[in-house]
Swiss-Prot record:
DNA-binding region per UniProt: 175-194
Gene Ontology molecular function: any one: DNA binding
Natural source organism: Bacillus subtilis (strain 168)
Chain positions found as 4-aspartylphosphate: D54
Source species taxonomy: Bacteria, Bacillati, Bacillota, Bacilli, Bacillales
Name under which the protein is recorded: Transcriptional regulatory protein LnrK
């Protein structure tokens, strides 16, 4: 059973989502929280598998909460709850180690599937939101007088197969899914991911996925 903490400053959202998810026998909502700091404190105490985290909250927002959790509790995954207006904050949360994000108005089935994906080691990156984030990154560059996002030299150090694996990381796939798609073993995927993280000098697979999206390896 997957243990979950739900974090949102709005009572109706927090309790409503908790009630919906508690109906699923594979999920156990062990606590709720009103802000990022409270989520962190409860995560330390209760050791959940996943924290569902709203982005915009008073006292301590979702980015701050994500940073606290991922830096101190590496076994706990964070999945962001957001709206289309929060793409800048989503990017910050991903850079702090969140395993993906969902729109708040998505169906319970979609949220459950996302939780299962994150729990199995994958990421959740809805294409429509990811494309919007990418467009904002491009727009930021254009405002600075740069027409295209230049690809870093580190990408040249990757093998063709590592580039393929990196692209799939950007689409949110876990090792098993990548192995099936590329017709290689999970162990081989794991080795490729380790090499990618080392060569790109990123912290983890989440950072590698962001890198892949930002520099156009994963195309949306």
């Amino acid at each position: 059973m997957i243990k979950i903490i739900i974090t949102d400053d709005q009572d109706i959202v927090r309790e409503g989502l908790a009630s919906l998810l508690q109906l699923r026998e594979e999920l156990d909502v062990i606590a709720t929280a009103r802000n990022g700091q409270e989520a962190f404190e409860k995560a330390k105490e209760l050791e959940p598998d996943i924290v569902l985290m709203d982005i915009r909250m008073p006292v301590s927002n979702g980015v701050e909460g994500t940073k606290l959790i991922t830096s101190s509790l590496p076994s706990v995954k964070v999945l962001m709850l957001t709206t289309f207006k929060d793409s800048a904050l989503i990017a910050e949360a991903l850079e702090e180690g969140a395993s993906g994000y969902l729109l708040k108005d998505m169906s319970a089935d979609t949220i459950v599937k996302a939780v299962m994906t994150v729990h199995s080691g994958g990421m959740v990156l809805p294409p429509e939101l990811t494309a919007q984030m990418l467009n904002e990154w491009k727009r930021e560059k254009q405002l600075k007088g740069i027409n295209e996002i230049e690809k870093p030299n580190e990408l040249l150090d990757l093998t063709e197969r590592e580039i393929e694996v990196l692209a799939e990381l950007g689409y949110g796939l876990n090792n098993k899914e990548i192995a099936e798609k590329l017709y290689i073993t999970e162990g081989t995927v794991k080795n490729h991911v380790s090499n990618i993280i080392s060569k790109l000098a990123v912290r983890d697979r989440t950072q590698a996925a962001i890198y892949s999206v930002r520099y156009g390896v994963s195309v949306f």
